[in-house]
């Protein structure tokens, strides 16, 4: 059987994966610092969450292309608490962030189009982009008493095939969150080059220290075609 070349990834065990496996096989403790799977973190879920699933109304199948209206309204209510006013018709629910990325790649890009992503960044992007025939170009974050974007470096990375700038706010794995001045510069670049600004805000509620300073990027980047999405409006498991 012949498979597509787009999935011809190197599947050899990495040095980190090998060290993890050997430690697990030896029964030694493992501190999984980037763990983000809530089903493995020992959380005690509110019984009301499970009780809601026993409601006979949950058996009523009423598919809505953008997702259940009440759920989309709940997303709007959440963003209102972050000073962002949205309407349910501006919200589309997906089964995962991976599906959301795939939808966006297909919406914004043709085969061979490019999207700029921060580096260091989330390695899953590389695999998702290949599946949708999109090329990722790395825009390096700069470290100077904390991580930050380099607007001029990003400008030099833009080509005629670039369709969007993609961010994680706060970033994974650096923890860097976009400051107001960075958002203004990124918005200016997007306007100048007719680019979309894609922002993954899955970690928006997990700022360290003065968490009140962590706002949705939409409050800063005005006048830009932007897409934001999150992955925490769900019950895992």
Where do the model's predicted regions map?
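N-terminal small-domain helix-loop-helix segment of the aminotransferase-like
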Residues: 2, 6-96, 103, 153
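Anion (oxyanion) recognition and catalysis
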Residues: 24-25, 130, 191
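Short catalytic/ligand-binding loop motif for oxyanion handling, primarily in non-cytosolic enzymes
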Residues: 26, 39-43, 174-175, 193, ...
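Residue-level marker for buried hydrophobic side chains located in beta-strands
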Residues: 169, 197-198
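PLP-dependent aminotransferase class I/II
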Residues: 226-237
């Amino acid at each position: 059987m012949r498979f597509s070349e787009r999935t011809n990834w190197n599947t050899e065990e990495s040095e980190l994966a090998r060290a993890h496996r050997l430690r697990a096989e030896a029964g030694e403790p493992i501190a999984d610092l980037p763990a983000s799977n809530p089903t493995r973190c020992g959380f005690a879920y509110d019984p009301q969450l499970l009780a809601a699933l026993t409601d006979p109304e949950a058996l009523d199948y009423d598919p809505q292309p953008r997702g259940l209206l009440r759920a989309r309204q709940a997303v709007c209510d959440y963003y209102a608490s972050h000073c962002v006013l949205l309407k349910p018709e501006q919200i589309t629910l997906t089964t995962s962030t991976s599906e959301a990325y795939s939808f966006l790649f297909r919406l914004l890009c043709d085969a061979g189009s490019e999207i700029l992503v921060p580096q260091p960044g989330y390695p899953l992007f590389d695999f998702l982009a290949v599946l949708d025939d999109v090329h990722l170009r790395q825009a390096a974050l700069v470290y100077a008493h904390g991580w930050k974007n380099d607007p001029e470096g990003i400008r030099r990375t833009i080509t005629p095939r670039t369709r969007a700038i993609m961010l994680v706010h706060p970033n994974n794995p650096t923890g860097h969150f976009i400051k107001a001045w960075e958002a203004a510069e990124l918005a200016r670049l997007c306007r100048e080059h007719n680019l979309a600004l894609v922002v993954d805000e899955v970690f928006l509620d997990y700022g360290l220290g003065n968490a009140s300073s962590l706002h949705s990027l939409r409050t800063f980047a005005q006048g830009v075609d932007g897409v934001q999405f999150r992955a925490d409006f769900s019950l895992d498991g």
